[in-house]
Amino acid sequence: MDYVEKLEDLLSQKYTYHEIAENLYLNYSSLIDTDEVYRIRKRLSEIFGCNMNDVRLIGSAHTGYTFKNDKLEIRKNPKDYDFAIISPNVFAAYFHKINVNKIETRNRGNYTKYILEGKIHPLYADPKFLKEMQTLYTMIANELDIKRHITVCFYLSEKAFIEGLVNYNHKLYSMVLKRIRDSAIRDLPEMVVKDIPKMEG
């Protein structure tokens, strides 16, 4: 499945941004090596003590595209596996492992913003927590012989996960929707003129 085409199709059918995020990230499987993704998801679920369905692949490894600097880029061979763990229990456990007083000043704003949205992004946690997570990523990659870099974020709930994706992808969805609408408007005059009956002189 082409995720860009699917995104355009869902927007054309007037799905809401939330429904699009649910479809693309909860309903459809990832584009790349699903056996490898399965092995990583299974291992992450064992390590974090959650269901395998609580572990979701996101990012360009899932959709085959990334959106940077207002440009949609196709990624046929992504460098990373970005995972989301959607579990209130795991979220609470890892929330309490973070030493808020040790978070670097430059990261505090992002850490607080994400926590209020029901997300833990290890990149903005304290250095010790981040290092432990990076060690874990390396261990999993070595254990399963994975060449791509692995990262994990934690979400309090499925609602927080979808809201986060909508916020992250809002600009992309709006850009694609505008392109669809502009295309429809460009086609409109030709159709209207064609459908007007000729006047007999």
Which positions does each model-derived feature cover?
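Catalytic core of pol beta-like nucleotidyltransferases
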Residues: 1-79, 86-201
